[in-house]
Amino acid sequence: MGAYKYMQELWRKKQSDVMRFLLRVRCWQYRQLSALHRAPRPTRPDKARRLGYKAKQGYVIYRVRVRRGGRKRPVPKGATYGKPVHHGVNQLKFARSLQSVAEERAGRHCGGLRVLNSYWVGEDSTYKFFEVILIDTFHKAIRRNPDTQWITKAVHKHREMRGLTSAGKKSRGLGKGHKFHLTIGGSRRAPWRRRNTLQLRRYR
């Protein structure tokens, strides 16, 4: 086994004494820093490389702190107006994961970079911490490499805002396997439209 395989196994056993101590110390360290800051290198190089990171020019890592918990409806004094069934303010759950929220914040802050992917690095009772991989699409090392040219195209601008990253697709219910049957056809709306469209086919 290579070194990265051993690192992967270490991160899988998060309840081991070593990892519990490391994660506690790191969470304390991350809490002292700002909510969004650049990391000098990936905390989990094995995970970052599996998600497409390379230790070369044009790749940037940002660490994002996201507050845990549900999403309160942003209404003044709890006045939602309308019918009582829609009066909920506090116990609402956001449709997207905190990881996709972290990607969005990193993408907003670094408007000139493209979000490639992200991964979990720690959490405590109040916050979750994610590291986001961003790519500088104007760097020659990215533009001249056939493997990374795809992300330089304009269609991939702010892909994190449109649910095109891995975390975003998961929240949209897109994927393979028995967990993702509701989105056969590309979206939640596609199978509904297919089932509810009357097709009177003419046979010759």
From Swiss-Prot:
Residues 169-180 have a biased composition (Basic residues). It holds the Pfam family Ribosomal_L15e. Keywords: Cytoplasm, Ribonucleoprotein, Ribosomal protein. Signal peptide: none annotated. GO terms for biological process: cytoplasmic translation. Its main location: cytoplasm. GO terms for molecular function: RNA binding; structural constituent of ribosome. It is found in: Cytoplasm. Residues 161-180 are annotated as: Disordered. GO terms for cellular component: cytosolic large ribosomal subunit. Component of the large ribosomal subunit. Component of the large ribosomal subunit. The ribosome is a large ribonucleoprotein complex responsible for the synthesis of proteins in the cell. Belongs to the eukaryotic ribosomal protein eL15 family. This is Large ribosomal subunit protein eL15. It comes from Ictalurus punctatus (Channel catfish).
